[in-house]
């Protein structure tokens, strides 16, 4: 089975966190079980792309992400506004990359960046994994409740 993970970060990354750790562990576990695994992640430098092998897991880092790491690209106001345009454009690139792989059986995305919303009609099952479900609980974690 060819499994594709989509995430904003994959180790090593300056923005790595829980999602990055989860993806790396699960991707390697699935590879070790005999599956073909591709990870599509954002490049830390939104100007650069790469395609590398991480011990059997293919890692594609896309340029043009909708967020930037100030210590890599600076922190100008213009760059912050550019991120609004890139929100859609970057998700379109993810979609195109998945389709270009040609033989993906299933795609897994976190809810955090809404990438799954743009993949609903690609003809491949898409699993949305909840990493931050408390943000979706408007009753217990709403701003109104804090006031």
Label the model's feature ranges.
Residues 9-11, 44-46, 64-67, 112-115, ...:
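Short, solvent-exposed loop/turn segments at secondary-structure junctions
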Residues 14, 68-80, 121-147:
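Acceptor-binding helix/loop patch of EC 2.4 sugar-transfer enzymes
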Residues 23, 90, 94, 111-112, ...:
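Amphipathic coiled-coil/heptad-repeat helices and related helical stalk/stem segments
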Residues 25-28, 59-62, 80-85, 128-131, ...:
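Short, surface-exposed linear patches
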Residues 39-101:
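A conserved catalytic-core segment of Leloir-type glycosyltransferases
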Residues 87-91, 106-137:
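An aromatic- and histidine-rich active-site surface loop
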